[in-house]
Amino acid sequence: MKLITAIIKPFKLEEVRASLDMLGITGMTITEVKGFGRQKGHTELYRGAEYVIDFLPKIKVEIAVSVDQVNDAIDAIIKSANTGKIGDGKIFVSSLDKVLRIRTGETDQDAI
């Protein structure tokens, strides 16, 4: 089992959710986060004053999938989150040692 963590632009969340849903991946955790990568933030004008915005709003999507779903899930996220502009995000894939559904006690693949 793998944990896929994707950091995406907030307005792309619904597209990402819909493309994962088409693969049968319906469970996910969404977190509002702030951060920056190569774009290093930006400046904005507010009431005539210039402000530096160091951290940009992003969405963190976390999904647990079986090993055979990893590549399809990554492809779906890339296709739906891509704008072709800087700041589109990142995808991280890590191993899951154990998954447990609290309500039923199911474990691993059955718990996903």
Feature annotation, model-predicted:
Residues 1-112:
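Positively charged, small/polar-rich N-terminal and surface patches that mediate targeting and assembly
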